[in-house]
């Protein structure tokens, strides 16, 4: 089961990256990790740096993917983002936290993607 979930996560992150690029974003970092946590995608669009959490599922039977981004997860993303901002001296930008949901199709390589801009604030 773990391998299947990893495959869904990898596929979802790639789909999210393609979507963001097509929407005019520049990808600054994927899977940024530090001692505070991880951010799936860090992207730039105009004067915004966005910290994107990607949630992928094989179905929405047990709830929407974004429902897995609980307060604790949001706090980890926020702290990791603060570290990234400080380490890169990105003081002249606005910042935003987005979520991308990806529901994968078992039968083929298709998927449904939902971009939730400004999904949360802390």
Curated annotation (Swiss-Prot):
Gene3D superfamilies: 3.40.1350.10. GO terms for molecular function: nucleic acid binding. NCBIfam families: PRK12497.1-3 (NF009150), YraN family protein (TIGR00252). Belongs to the UPF0102 family. Pfam families: UPF0102. This is UPF0102 protein CA_C1763. It comes from Clostridium acetobutylicum (strain ATCC 824 / DSM 792 / JCM 1419 / IAM 19013 / LMG 5710 / NBRC 13948 / NRRL B-527 / VKM B-1787 / 2291 / W). SUPFAM superfamilies: Restriction endonuclease-like.
């Amino acid at each position: 089961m773990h391998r299947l979930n990893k495959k869904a996560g990898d596929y979802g992150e790639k789909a999210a990256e393609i979507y963001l690029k097509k929407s005019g974003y520049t990808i600054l970092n994927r899977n940024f990790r530090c001692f505070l946590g991880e951010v799936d995608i860090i992207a730039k669009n105009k004067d915004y740096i966005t910290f994107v959490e990607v949630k992928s599922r094989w179905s929405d039977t047990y709830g929407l993917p974004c429902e897995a981004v609980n307060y604790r997860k949001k706090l980890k993303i926020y702290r990791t983002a603060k570290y990234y901002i400080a380490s890169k001296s990105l003081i002249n930008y606005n910042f935003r936290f987005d979520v991308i949901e990806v529901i994968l199709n078992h039968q083929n390589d298709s998927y449904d993607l939902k971009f939730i801009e400004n999904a949360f604030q802390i």
